C-alpha cells in the first residue's frame, strides 16, 4: 500500500465525497440531481437536534441499543492467548447491525416526503431491516434480491414478505448482490420523485458512503465507551467482516485515530484467492469504479467486473466501500482473506463453546479473531464485531454438510 500520512481520519470524506482518491459520484447525469437533493437533506437532518433525538430514541426503544460487549471466556480458553470480546450486534431487533442504518435512512425518507422505499439485499438482513422500518413508518417497500441469494436465504425472503414488502428476484449477471444493486438503482432513477433508495452498505455514490457510516457509527461509539467502563482501556486489536463494509466501518470509525488499536477487516476468500472463486476486493482486487464510486473491485485486466463467490451471501460482492479502500492504502486497517472452510469452522466452534450462532458473514471475523488471539498474551483484548445472527444460515450450512432440515 502507499505511504499516505493521515493526521485525522475523521476529516474524511472531503466536500466532494472523496476519501483520498476513492469515493465520489460516478453516475449518469439523471442521478446527479437526486444525489444532490439527498446530500442536502442529509446534511440538514444530521445537524437538526430533533432528527437526532428521534433517531436515538428509535435506537434505544425499537432497536434495543446499546448492544452489549460479551466476554467469550470458553472460546478464549479453547483458542488460547488473548481474551476474545464480542460486540453483540446480533442481539439487535431484526438480528443484525443493518437496522442502525435503515432506521436513520427511513426517518430521512419520511422527512423528505417520500412514500416509497427501495433496497437491495444479499443475505436478506438489509432487506428485512428495510421492510421492518417501512412497516413501522407506513411506507411502501420494494426489495431487490438476486435469484441465487433468494434460494440460499429463503427464510429472510419470507420474513420480508411477512413485513409487507415486495421482493423482486434479479436474474441478470450472477444473480447476487451486485445485480440487485444495479436493479435498485434503475428503479430509483425511474421513480425518484416519490422513492427513497436505502443502500445497505458504505458503497455507492456520495453521500451514501458517509451517510451509512454515520448511521452505523453508534456501534463504535458504544464499544469505545463500554471498553473504557468495563476494562479500563481500549482493545489491543479488533476485527469485523468486510463485504461492502458497513458493520466494519461502524465499529472501526471511533477507533481510527487511536494508534494503539490494531484494526483488521476480514474479506471473503471463498474457495481460496488462488482459485479465483472469492470476493476479496482489497486483498485480491484493484482500483476501479463500481456502483457510482471509485474503490477496490474484483475485475480482470481490462477492468471488467468478475463474478465472485462466498458461502456468505452478504459478502458475495465484487467491491468495497471507498473508505475501506482509503484505509487500506493508508495502512491504518489491514485486510485479510478468510476462506469458506475457515468461516464455517469458526461458526461451529463459537456455537459449541458459547451457545451463539453467528451469521456466516460474522463468522469470517470470528475466524480472524481467533488467529489474532493465538498470537497475543493472555491479558490482551481482541474485540470482534458479531454483526449478525446465524439463524438465516442454518439451511445453507446444513445443505453444505449433507443434512436435511
From Swiss-Prot:
Q: What class of enzyme is it?
A: lyase
Cofactor field: pyridoxal 5'-phosphate
Q: Which reaction does it catalyse?
A: (1S,2R)-1-C-(indol-3-yl)glycerol 3-phosphate + L-serine = D-glyceraldehyde 3-phosphate + L-tryptophan + H2O
Q: Which GO terms describe its molecular function?
A: tryptophan synthase activity
**SUPFAM superfamilies documented for this protein:** Tryptophan synthase beta subunit-like PLP-dependent enzymes (SSF53686)
What is the top-level taxon of the source organism?
Bacteria
Q: List the disulfide bonds.
A: none
Named in its record, the pathway it takes part in is: Amino-acid biosynthesis; L-tryptophan biosynthesis; L-tryptophan from chorismate: step 5/5
By its UniProt entry, which CDD domains does this protein fall under?
Answer: Trp-synth_B
Give the UniProt entry's GO cellular component terms: cytoplasm
Q: What is its EC number?
A: 4.2.1.20
Give a single Pfam family match: PALP
Q: Which InterPro entries is this protein grouped with? A: Trp_synth_b_CS (IPR006653), Trp_synth_beta (IPR006654), Trp_synth_beta/beta-like (IPR023026), TrpB-like_PALP (IPR001926), TrpB-like_PALP_sf (IPR036052)
Keywords of this entry:
Amino-acid biosynthesis, Aromatic amino acid biosynthesis, Lyase, Pyridoxal phosphate, Tryptophan biosynthesis
Modified positions (N6-(pyridoxal phosphate)lysine) in chain numbering: 98
Family label? Belongs to the TrpB family.
Describe its assembly: Tetramer of two alpha and two beta chains.
- Give a short account of what the protein does: The beta subunit is responsible for the synthesis of L-tryptophan from indole and L-serine.
Report the protein name in the record: Tryptophan synthase beta chain
Amino acid at each position: 500500500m502507499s505511504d499516505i500520512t493521515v493526521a485525522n481520519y475523521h476529516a474524511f470524506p472531503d466536500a466532494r465525497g472523496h476519501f483520498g482518491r476513492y469515493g465520489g459520484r460516478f453516475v449518469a447525469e439523471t442521478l446527479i440531481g437526486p444525489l444532490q437533493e439527498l446530500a442536502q437533506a442529509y446534511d440538514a437532518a444530521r445537524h437538526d437536534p430533533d432528527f437526532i433525538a428521534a433517531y436515538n430514541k428509535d435506537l434505544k426503544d425499537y432497536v434495543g441499543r446499546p448492544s452489549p460487549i460479551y466476554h467469550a471466556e470458553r472460546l478464549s480458553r479453547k483458542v488460547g492467548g488473548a481474551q476474545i470480546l464480542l460486540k453483540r450486534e446480533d442481539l439487535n431487533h431484526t438480528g443484525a447491525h443493518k437496522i442502525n442504518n435503515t432506521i436513520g435512512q427511513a426517518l430521512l425518507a419520511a422527512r423528505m416526503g417520500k412514500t416509497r422505499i427501495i433496497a437491495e439485499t444479499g443475505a436478506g438482513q438489509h432487506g428485512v431491516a428495510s421492510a421492518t422500518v417501512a412497516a413501522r413508518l407506513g411506507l411502501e417497500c420494494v426489495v431487490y434480491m438476486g435469484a441465487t441469494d433468494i434460494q440460499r436465504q429463503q427464510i429472510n425472503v419470507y420474513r420480508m414478505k411477512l413485513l409487507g414488502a415486495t421482493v423482486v428476484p434479479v436474474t441478470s449477471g450472477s444473480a447476487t448482490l451486485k445485480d440487485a444493486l444495479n436493479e435498485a438503482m434503475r428503479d430509483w432513477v425511474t421513480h425518484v420523485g416519490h422513492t427513497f433508495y436505502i443502500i445497505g452498505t458504505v458503497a455507492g455514490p456520495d453521500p451514501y458512503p458517509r451517510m451509512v457510516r454515520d448511521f452505523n457509527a453508534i456501534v463504535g461509539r458504544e464499544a469505545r465507551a463500554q471498553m473504557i467502563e468495563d476494562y479500563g482501556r481500549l482493545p489491543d486489536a479488533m476485527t469485523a467482516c468486510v463485504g461492502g463494509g458497513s458493520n466494519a466501518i461502524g465499529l472501526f470509525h471511533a477507533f481510527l485515530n487511536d494508534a494503539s488499536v490494531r484494526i483488521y477487516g476480514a474479506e471473503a476468500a471463498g474457495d481460496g484467492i488462488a482459485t479465483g472463486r472469492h470476493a476479496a476486493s482489497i486483498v485480491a482486487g484493484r482500483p476501479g469504479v463500481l456502483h457510482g464510486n471509485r474503490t477496490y473491485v474484483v475485475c480482470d485486466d481490462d477492468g471488467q467486473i468478475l463474478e465472485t463467490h462466498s458461502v456468505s451471501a452478504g459478502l458475495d460482492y465484487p467491491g468495497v466501500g471507498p473508505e475501506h479502500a482509503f484505509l487500506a492504502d493508508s495502512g491504518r486497517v489491514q485486510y485479510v482473506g478468510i476462506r469458506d472452510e475457515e468461516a464455517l469452522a469458526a461458526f461451529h466452534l463459537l456455537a459449541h463453546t458459547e451457545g451463539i450462532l453467528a451469521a456466516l458473514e460474522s463468522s469470517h471475523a470470528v475466524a480472524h479473531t481467533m488467529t489474532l488471539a493465538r498470537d497475543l498474551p493472555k491479558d490482551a483484548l481482541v474485540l470482534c464485531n458479531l454483526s449478525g445472527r446465524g439463524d438465516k444460515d442454518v439451511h445453507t450450512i446444513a445443505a453444505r454438510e449433507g443434512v436435511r432440515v
